[in-house]
Every structure is written in C-alpha cells, then in structure tokens.
Amino acid sequence: MSVTTWNLNGTKHHVLICNGSSCMRKGGEEATQAIRNKVAELNLDEAVHTTRTCNGRCKDAPVAIVYPSGDWYKQVTEKVAHRIVEEHLAGGCSLKESLIYEYDQKGFVSPENSDSIEGIDKVKSNA
C-alpha cells in the first residue's frame, strides 16, 4: 500500500472538508469536489491543501474549515464552496454569513447574529 506524503512548503491555506456520515448525506462529497475543482480551475493547487475529515459539527453539515484564519463554514453547498475558494482563499475575505466560528487570537468565537447551534461543551463539569 502506498502512502502519500505531501510537501506543504509554500502552502498558504489548509481546508478541512467534513466527509463524516452526516456531512456526506447532506452534500459533503459535492462540496469537496466543488472546492477542489475551483482550486484547480484558479491554479491555486500550490497554495491550497485540502483534507477530508470529520469536524464534529453534524448539525451544520457539511462543514469546511479554512486555516490559518480559523474560519469554520456551515452548510457548504457547491455555490458556497466556490465562493470560499474565490472570495476567501483567492481574495482574502471571509464569507461572514456562512461562518459558525472565527478565530480571534483568544480562541474560536461565534460571529454576532449567528444562527448556528451552540453544541455540546467539550469540558465536562464535575457535578
């Protein structure tokens, strides 16, 4: 079995695209292909690396996370996927209306007026 090891020197963005079962039922494969195809179309292959994974936000499926900015996008349709590549990765502007979380140097925060669910706390109380 061959294992791929990418040389990521010079990579500017890493996009984690959710391909867990909930996301796949809600268009995760289409979102993945839309992002990858638009990256190729705009000749951004050397600047953008994509990874299929599970991001643990099933209620917001499908989800894509862009680093290094730390922006989490919800309900990524093919149209939103194209906009992520064109406006965020190529243009440097987040899609505020599609954000679940953004990073503010103190940690992840939900944008104002977000309609996304809060989710389960990662730290369990000792109650």
UniProtKB/Swiss-Prot annotation:
SUPFAM superfamilies: Thioredoxin-like. Keywords: 2Fe-2S, Electron transport, Iron, Iron-sulfur, Metal-binding, Transport. GO terms for molecular function: 2 iron, 2 sulfur cluster binding; metal ion binding. InterPro entries: Thioredoxin-like_sf (IPR036249). Its cofactor is [2Fe-2S] cluster. [2Fe-2S] cluster binds at residues 23, 54, 58. Binds 1 [2Fe-2S] cluster. Transmembrane segments: none annotated. It holds the Pfam family 2Fe-2S_thioredx. It comes from the Bacteria. Belongs to the 2Fe2S Shethna-type ferredoxin family. Ferredoxins are iron-sulfur proteins that transfer electrons in a wide variety of metabolic reactions. This is Putative 2Fe-2S ferredoxin. It comes from Priestia megaterium. The gene is cbiW.
